[in-house]
């Protein structure tokens, strides 16, 4: 399958996931509604009122005599430039920034419009608000194939002529054509953003808390929407009461039944059905309903009474209007915001809350096991684009508040309001630059930005493919450090440091991709075409969850999953969208969010791969690309959650060391590099018909044809492209790692990065990088 692997790396570099994440974050010609643009349009300073995002961000001034608001939108990222001492600007190149100890960055511009009493003034377009560091080889970089040749756009992945021209232009600019990019240049030093593991948002995890020898069943969810994260906890106390804790409500616990009544479920039977699971859970549900009705502390039996109880708890002593507004804010914005923030979304939240409670009760009666927190379906990887997005959100908020303050000062002094005279670009620039230069990120994290390890080419590659865990290094965390089955093919099982970082600092496997967010509207539209509907009774049918949000139900869930996968294999649905059917709870989970580690596998249909020998020949000649194989339904990207439903063969067959007995040229050695699979893709085949190139004792080369049994059956759904792809870039260079003990291979991955080669041929070139070479190379 080497043709498929070579095709994959012709399309993507080894740091493609970092580049793609950063490109998705920044604005560009084909990404006008980027993450940075969404942040700008969501700005609300001086007001809490909901406005349309299409009109841009909103800054409202606190002045008495007039109603003044500022609208901001249309963020643009210019060409990377250097400003000289005389004030002139000229395009910058990464090598120039390295030599002159400068930062490789671009100007950030936006459009502002001031409204006075609802009347707009002349818009100020293209106002520079600061500078943004640019990732080397990203879409905005001057070395990118779209910009390096002037007006001509090069296509180095599909055209040999363009590739040679691109490499020559890189050499002229002092760059190494083999350098993959994926890092920043800050004050002349190369810095890389380390990918970080994080808990997946909008997913319910059930666990048992042990305090003072007491066990409590607890369910947790981090509900996230537009960068806003609201944790929610449901726990079953020792007396059987089911209580909810909302992070923004402090330590106050709310009975689940009371909260569900406040959300609109007033009928006891409907409330019971929303929670009911196995028969053993019925007594707990009835007891909670009666407790909320009869206990003097609550005495709640209707939605109005539930609202009244919440008003007393969270806005006691305030006016009626304020109390109602506080409860509405709690129910709409602070409770499970990923399900919506409108009044009509409350019923859906009540149903979702009932599902969480059911899982807690099922664990209480031991019919459900605690969730595996180390399962990679419950984790997401935050890449450079996600980290820059967090940093830009905080920096932009700080800039907007500073602009509001400066405009109010100008207005109070009776000066003309001009954005260019009030805005201070250094506010945004200094905030971003400080974080990238020191590694101290927003949220209190440190070590996010690190100096790129340039000891060798391999050490730099490994550094940019590193994935770190946020767990404290001084604690044991035995389970978190262990290899997990869901890391197969996603994270290298061998490449990890020795010592306290062991198992917490990992490296990506060779052939992976990390998902970017796919708009949910695309999937919802497709589901509507597949007869998914929104019922009045959410307990009827198989529920469909899109990124944790209950979207609708379907009468035949398994048929929907099959239909959805077929559409994805035809290219009608994006390849990074995953789907899984939960047989136990009759739920369908669809994930379109970012940060899921995906790996490619071959699709099997009725016990035969869709890949044929013709496909391999066309891929080898360049007629087909790896992307074409995905769009034709030959190869499929899968994440850890969807893999739970699959049956994957580790290899199609076991190749003998020599031609088997009973065949011509028996006993002659064979290898994978000389094998042609003649009946590849043939339906109902039980043996693989192989043709091997062999060498006879007299030196003559010929072909030997023989059969070996296939390892996959009609029950298998997929097959690995190559088992060796489970290793990372360092472990894959160790000869025969399967014949060594694991600790030795782990030590070998560290030594591989220390092997010095020839750094460059032109030693007189003014390179700012540390040059390391062996003064006494081994003669062996």
Regions found by a protein language model. Name each.
Residues 766-770, 774-780:
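Positively charged, low-complexity/disordered segments
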